[in-house]
Regions:
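A structural signal for well-ordered alpha-helices, especially hydrophobic packing surfaces
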Residues: 32, 59-69, 90-94, 116-123, ...
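Carboxylate-rich helix-loop segments that flank metal/cofactor sites and access channels
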Residues: 2-5, 67-107, 167-179
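Terminal targeting/low-complexity segments that flank the catalytic cores of oxidoreductases
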Residues: 1-13, 19, 179-187
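Conserved alpha-helical segments that form or flank metal/cofactor-binding pockets of metalloenzymes
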Residues: 45-84, 152-155
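Preference for long, well-ordered alpha-helical segments
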Residues: 108-187
Length: 187
C-alpha cells in the first residue's frame, strides 16, 4: 500500500486526525464517567473492580491526553467532551434505568472497545503524519487498556454466578433494594 504525500491527502489526514482526536477525547471522558457510574451501581464485586481499574487508567492518562490535544483543538476537544457528557447523561437517565445490570455492563464494555478502536485508527493516522508524541500516546493507551478491557470481559462470568443481580434493572440495583444488590449477594 503506497502513501502518496499529496497536499490534498495531508489536509484530509489532518481533518481525520482532528475528528479522531475529538472522538478519543469523548471516549476517554466516557471511560471515566461510565465506568465509575457502573462500578458504583454494582458496588463490591469483580466486574465493578475491573471498571474502577479502567476509570483510574483513563484518569491517569487524561493530563497527557489534554496536553497533546487541547493546544491544537481547544474548542473541538471541549465540544467532544460536552457531547460525551450529554450522551452520558442521557444514558444515565434513560437507558441505564431500564437495562439489566449485566446488559448495562456489556454496553459499557462496548463503549470501551469503541474507544480502543478509535485509538488504533488515530495511531495509524499519526504514524502517517509523523506525529510521534500522539502516536506513542495511542500505543500506550492501547497496550494498557486492552489488558484492562480483557480482564473486564472475563469478569462477565460473575453475572452467570449471580443471575438475580444480572437480571435486575440498573434502577433497582442502584436503589440498593434487597438481595438484588451485588453487595447483598456477597458473603
Amino acid at each position: 500500500m503506497s502513501r502518496a504525500p499529496a497536499v490534498g491527502m495531508s489536509i484530509e489526514h489532518r481533518r481525520l486526525r482532528e475528528k479522531l482526536c475529538r472522538e478519543l477525547a469523548q471516549s476517554e471522558h466516557d471511560a471515566v464517567v461510565h465506568t465509575a457510574r457502573e462500578a458504583a451501581r454494582l458496588r463490591a464485586c469483580p466486574p465493578a473492580e475491573k471498571l474502577r481499574a479502567i476509570a483510574a487508567h483513563a484518569e491517569y492518562l487524561r493530563p497527557r491526553l489534554d496536553a497533546l490535544l487541547i493546544p491544537d483543538q481547544p474548542f473541538g476537544i471541549r465540544i467532544g467532551r460536552l457531547v460525551g457528557e450529554m450522551f452520558s447523561g442521557l444514558r444515565h437517565l434513560v437507558a441505564d434505568r431500564v437495562l439489566s445490570a449485566e446488559r448495562s455492563y456489556r454496553a459499557t464494555l462496548l463503549g470501551l472497545r469503541h474507544g480502543i478502536d478509535v485509538a488504533w485508527l488515530l495511531r495509524d493516522v499519526t504514524r502517517r503524519e509523523d506525529n510521534i508524541r500522539l502516536f506513542r500516546f495511542c500505543d500506550d493507551l492501547i497496550a494498557e487498556r486492552e489488558v484492562l478491557l480483557r480482564e473486564a470481559e472475563r469478569a462477565l462470568v460473575w453475572f452467570a454466578d449471580h443471575p438475580s443481580i444480572a437480571m435486575a434493572s440498573c434502577a433497582h440495583t442502584a436503589l440498593g433494594s434487597g438481595a438484588a444488590t451485588p453487595s447483598a449477594a456477597l458473603p
